[in-house]
Structure formats: structure tokens, C-alpha cells
Amino acid sequence: MQKPLGVILAGGLATRMGGGDKGLLSLGGQSLLSRVIDRLAPQVAGLALNANGDAARFAGLGLPVVADTIEGFAGPLAGVLAGLDWAAEQGAEAIVTAAADTPFFPTDLVARLTAAAEGQAHPLVLATTPKSGDEVLKSGGKGRVNRHPTFGLWPVALRDDLRAAIEGGLRKVVLWTDQHGGREALFEAEPFDPFFNVNTPEDLARAEALLR
């Protein structure tokens, strides 16, 4: 399998941060997006940013910006589809996605996702972390892992199927990945979950503390 392209998902609405682009928030003197770029770029063959609206606000990042091709903020799957369409134009086989508000994801993300896809006709893998004891209890014992649907390996070959699913109203990532035999790559969640994302001002303060 050739080295995948990377797509950073920044197309959502940051309602819990008062709107605007979460990825442009500063964390330790560097934007969240810049931190995500620094982590993902060494792992992939090339990078693009999925974002909607005026692309000029991201001009300083030096990345191609690809907007959702499905209107109405259809969620992460629309961003994945936009990334797959871009990757198809580059002649790539697959992409790895990462969220723009998750600055601590693993530096071996891509290697472990691609390893988990070995033998798959169409590589499709989501990142997971173990649930804590409290989380298992709250879920009634259903499932022992948390799946992180914005962190995955996605095959260009299934983009038309994904487009049809989104146009048909599908929004939940794991429903689509399960339909296509998606696998999981398990990452440790100690000393903290590396897929911790910044959704609120309190989360941003916690991220600042983790940098120290």
C-alpha cells in the first residue's frame, strides 16, 4: 500500500467555543491547526485541509483547502468525502484523517492504522482507545473501546458509495465503517487519551496544562 495522503477535518461548527474556527485558537503560542499539521505532515505523502467558507483565512498554513461537496454541514463524513475526492485527483489510494482540534494524537497514527488494514481489499480503519471503568459502567457494559471517527484510514475506492450514503441521509461514521468491514487500531489512553479534543474553553485550559 502506498503512503496515504492526510486530510485535516476542520469543517464543523464550533458552537461550544462561541463559533469561529477552533483550529485557529492558540495553544502554547501556536494554533491548534499548526500543531496538528506538525504531527500529521511527517506521517503522510501530502496534506489538505477540509474547511468550509472563505479559504483565505487559512492562507498562512500553505495547504490546499477542500470544502464539503455535500451542502448543509453533513458532519465528519462529508469532510472525509471531500478529502477522498481530493485524493482521487492526486491519484492516491487512501487518506488518513485527523481532527483540527485534537493536538496530541499519536505520532505513529498512520503507521498503526495502515498496519491494522493489512489484507483488506479496501483499507478502512478507525482509531480506538480503551474505555475507562466508569465509561464501561455507564454504557451498560456495551463495548470496551471508544472509537474516534475523525481519526481513520479511508479508501478512495469507496468514495462513490460514501457519497450515496451521505446523500441518502447517513451521518453516523461508525454505521458506514461497520457496513464495510471497518477495522480498529487500538491506542493507549494513559496518561491521557491522545484523541482528547478541544471543544470548550475548559478543554483549552486543560490542553495548556498538558503542555507544561
What residue ranges belong to the model's regions?
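Nucleotide and nucleotide-moiety/phosphate-recognizing core
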Residues: 1-173, 178-194, 201-202, 209-212
